[in-house]
């Protein structure tokens, strides 16, 4: 082989190519790990029209970046960073992209709360439970966790049916036996049972004023689980 000049030239070319590729690889690795490419700026905005955030603070984002987002501009794992931002209490969905030469652009969709769920969680408009608290006046949902989307739907139905009376839904309860109970903003409790919910609530709305006039007092409790009527109790 050592007398074969053609073979020696091929080996030399191969070694030269390997050395060149190794050098390029090492230079790339050295370059991307340079301290000259640290992440210095994180631009965060809402995906809403205004771009303003309602619940997520820039301090929270900065803290997350310093504690959990590793790497520099070139080495950062954008998918891992996205998951990290989505751990923030009010972030429903996040997207992350690089901004040359040392920044990140983070766009978040914040949860829009619809109701309280227990003492330390909320329900958003998509029927998802997330761990956050709010002082905003909202209805309270109580029921099986797996039924939360159904409760969001029924809350919308109840709210629409009660519009003629201008009565608000303050609490929606769904028992383990799937019986529904609604408490209104004026304190009235409506027992709706497990079936014919809309029909029963429509009956309440249609006869409310007549029943209140006869009793001459506000209703405190209404049992709508009867076939063709309901039982009502006044505040006195």
UniProtKB/Swiss-Prot annotation:
Sum up the protein's function in the record's words. Essential cell division protein. May link together the upstream cell division proteins, which are predominantly cytoplasmic, with the downstream cell division proteins, which are predominantly periplasmic. May control correct divisome assembly.
Compartmental location: Cell inner membrane
- What name goes with this protein? Cell division protein FtsQ
Spell out the family assignment given in the record's similarity comment: Belongs to the FtsQ/DivIB family. FtsQ subfamily.
Which GO biological process entries does UniProt record here? cell septum assembly; FtsZ-dependent cytokinesis
Q: Where would I find the POTRA domain in this sequence?
A: 37-111
Transmembrane segments annotated in the record for this chain: 15-37
Show which residues sit on the Periplasmic side of the membrane: 38-236
- Gene3D superfamilies on file: Cell division protein FtsQ/DivIB, membrane protein fhac
Q: Which keywords has UniProt assigned to this entry?
A: Cell cycle, Cell division, Cell inner membrane, Cell membrane, Membrane, Transmembrane, Transmembrane helix
UniProt topology in membrane: Single-pass type II membrane protein
Per the record, its GO cellular-component terms are: cell division site; plasma membrane
Fill in the subunit field for this protein.
Part of a complex composed of FtsB, FtsL and FtsQ.
Main site of residence? membrane
Stored InterPro entries: Cell_div_FtsQ/DivIB_C, FtsQ, FtsQ_C_sf, POTRA, POTRA_FtsQ_type
The stretches that face the Cytoplasmic side, renumbered to this chain, are 1-14
């Amino acid at each position: 082989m050592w007398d074969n000049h053609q073979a020696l030239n091929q080996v030399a070319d191969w070694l030269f190519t390997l050395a060149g590729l190794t050098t390029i690889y090492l230079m790339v690795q050295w370059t991307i790990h340079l301290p000259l490419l640290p992440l210095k700026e994180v631009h965060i905005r809402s995906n809403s029209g205004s771009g303003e955030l309602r619940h997520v603070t820039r301090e929270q984002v900065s803290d997350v970046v310093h504690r959990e987002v590793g790497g520099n501009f070139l080495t950062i794992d954008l998918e891992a960073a996205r998951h990290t931002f989505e751990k923030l209490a009010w972030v429903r969905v996040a997207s992350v992209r690089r901004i040359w030469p040392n920044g990140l652009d983070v766009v978040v969709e914040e949860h829009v709360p619809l109701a309280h769920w227990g003492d330390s969680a909320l329900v958003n408009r998509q029927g998802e439970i997330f761990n956050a608290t709010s002082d905003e006046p909202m209805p309270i949902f109580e029921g099986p966790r797996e039924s939360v989307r159904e409760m969001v739907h029924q809350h919308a139905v109840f709210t629409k049916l009660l519009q003629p009376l201008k009565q608000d839904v303050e609490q929606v309860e769904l028992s383990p036996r799937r019986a529904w109970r609604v408490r209104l903003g004026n304190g009235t409790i409506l027992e709706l049972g497990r079936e014919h919910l809309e029909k029963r609530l429509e009956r309440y709305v249609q006869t409310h004023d007549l029943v209140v006039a006869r009793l001459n007092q506000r209703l405190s409790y209404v049992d709508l689980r009867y076939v063709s009527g309901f039982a009502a109790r006044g505040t006195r």
